[in-house]
């Protein structure tokens, strides 16, 4: 499935990992991007 940002646009991060945090946690949630070294 395609994940969308807050503007409704597809999230693009070059094939790295991302984590979705719930809004009730921390500073309001968000995404964390990380490269894995195994992108294709």
From Swiss-Prot:
The keyword Cell division appears for this protein: no
Catalytic activity: Preferential cleavage: Arg-|-Xaa, Lys-|-Xaa
SUPFAM superfamilies in alphabetical order: STI-like
Keywords: Hydrolase, Protease inhibitor, Serine protease inhibitor
A GO molecular-function descriptor: serine-type endopeptidase activity
Activity across pH: Stable in the pH range 2.2-10.0.
Enzyme class label: hydrolase
Domain of life, source organism: Eukaryota
InterPro entries assigned to the protein according to its UniProt record, in alphabetical order: Kunitz_inhibitor_STI-like_sf
Enzyme Commission number(s): 3.4.21.4
Gene3D superfamilies for this protein: 2.80.10.50
Temperature dependence, free-text field: Stable at temperatures up to 70 degrees Celsius. Incubation at temperatures above 70 degrees Celsius steadily decreases inhibitory activity.
Family named by the database record: Belongs to the protease inhibitor I3 (leguminous Kunitz-type inhibitor) family.
Primary role: Inhibits trypsin but not chymotrypsin, papain or porcine pancreatic alpha-amylase. Has insecticidal activity against A.aegypti. Functions by inhibiting the A.aegypti midgut proteases to reduce the survival of larva and adults.
Subunit: Monomer.
Name of protein: Trypsin inhibitor
Biological source species: Cassia leiandra
């Amino acid at each position: 499935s395609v994940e969308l940002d807050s503007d409704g646009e597809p999230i693009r991060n070059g094939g790295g990992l991302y984590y979705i945090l719930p809004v009730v946690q921390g500073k309001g949630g968000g995404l964390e991007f990380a490269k894995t070294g195994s992108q294709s």
